[in-house]
């Protein structure tokens, strides 16, 4: 189960919170879901180069607040906040409602799975070797303090005739452990040979309740490193 399902959705209510935080009625449920989709699609397209790791949408009875967590917030804010004001106006025109925007900095960009996946996808589009791109992201996550990372790329890698999947694993990524705090990201690289899917899982440690003790592991054991290739049919 843990190998197939989205690890963020599996852990909602355990050690992850929802990214859309509001309580709907039957009358506005469909409208709110549609607005959330439009907001996220617009911001990801408009602010792609700002390195967005998370978009939170919060609603009250009269207010709608959007929080954007980005690795390069200066690109969004602009000089004296002028770009944020323009962005707010565009969002208000998009959904015909008043919107408050908060910009937060992603302090550990290397430990963000979404940013890591987008980084690999960008490098693949620039025709950088996929193994080199994967190793670079793994090194960045380790420097940021990640306890484990798995990177998977799928498609016509290197322009090969047959599609295949390759992945690297460093450290531990316990997908079946619900108390494990695992971040997940997905991106697509649009190359001349077709689309290449990129998936990244990052293990940041275990979230323990009071009275619980972490599992004992051998500190002297070297980090696990493996690579597996699966050819497409």
UniProtKB/Swiss-Prot annotation:
GO CC terms, sorted: cytosolic small ribosomal subunit
One Pfam family linked to the record: KH_2
InterPro entries in UniProt: KH_dom, KH_dom-like_a/b, KH_dom_type_2, KH_sf_prok-type, Ribosomal_S3_C_sf, Ribosomal_uS3_bac-typ, Ribosomal_uS3_C, Ribosomal_uS3_CS
Keyword terms, alphabetized: Ribonucleoprotein, Ribosomal protein, RNA-binding, rRNA-binding
Residue spans of biased composition, Basic residues class: 224-233
Region (Disordered): 212-233
Any one GO biological process: translation
Domain KH type-2: 39-107
Compositionally biased region (Basic and acidic residues): 212-222
Gene3D superfamilies per record: 3.30.300.20, Ribosomal protein S3, C-terminal domain
Gene Ontology MF annotations: mRNA binding; rRNA binding; structural constituent of ribosome
Source taxon at top rank: Bacteria
Function description: Binds the lower part of the 30S subunit head. Binds mRNA in the 70S ribosome, positioning it for translation.
The family this protein is said to belong to: Belongs to the universal ribosomal protein uS3 family.
PANTHER family: 30S/40S RIBOSOMAL PROTEIN S3 (PTHR11760), SMALL RIBOSOMAL SUBUNIT PROTEIN US3C (PTHR11760:SF19)
HAMAP family on file: Ribosomal_uS3_B
Quaternary context: Part of the 30S ribosomal subunit. Forms a tight complex with proteins S10 and S14.
Name recorded for this polypeptide: Small ribosomal subunit protein uS3
Organism from which the protein derives: Campylobacter jejuni subsp. doylei (strain ATCC BAA-1458 / RM4099 / 269.97)
Designated gene of the protein: rpsC
């Amino acid at each position: 189960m843990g190998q197939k399902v989205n690890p963020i959705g599996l852990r909602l209510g355990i050690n992850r919170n929802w990214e859309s935080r509001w309580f709907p009625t039957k009358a506005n449920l469909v409208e709110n879901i549609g607005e959330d989709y439009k907001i996220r699609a617009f911001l990801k397209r408009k602010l792609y180069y700002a390195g967005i790791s998370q978009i939170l949408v919060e609603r009250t009875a009269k207010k709608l607040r959007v929080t954007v967590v980005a690795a390069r917030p200066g690109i969004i804010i602009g000089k004296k906040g002028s770009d944020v004001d323009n962005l707010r106006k565009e969002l208000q025109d998009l959904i015909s409602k008043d919107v408050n925007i908060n910009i937060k900095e992603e302090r550990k960009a290397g430990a963000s799975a979404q940013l890591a996946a987008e980084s690999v996808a960008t490098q693949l589009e620039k025709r950088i070797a996929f193994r080199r791109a994967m190793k670079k992201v793994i090194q960045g996550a380790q420097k940021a303090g990640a306890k484990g990372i798995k990177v998977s790329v799928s498609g016509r890698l290197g322009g090969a005739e047959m599609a295949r999947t390759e992945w690297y694993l460093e450290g531990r990524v316990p997908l079946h452990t619900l108390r494990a705090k695992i971040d997940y990201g997905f991106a697509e690289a649009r190359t001349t040979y077709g689309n290449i899917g990129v998936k990244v899982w990052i293990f940041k440690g275990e979230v323990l309740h009071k009275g619980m003790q972490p599992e004992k592991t051998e500190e002297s054991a070297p980090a696990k490193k493996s690579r597996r290739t699966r050819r497409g049919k």
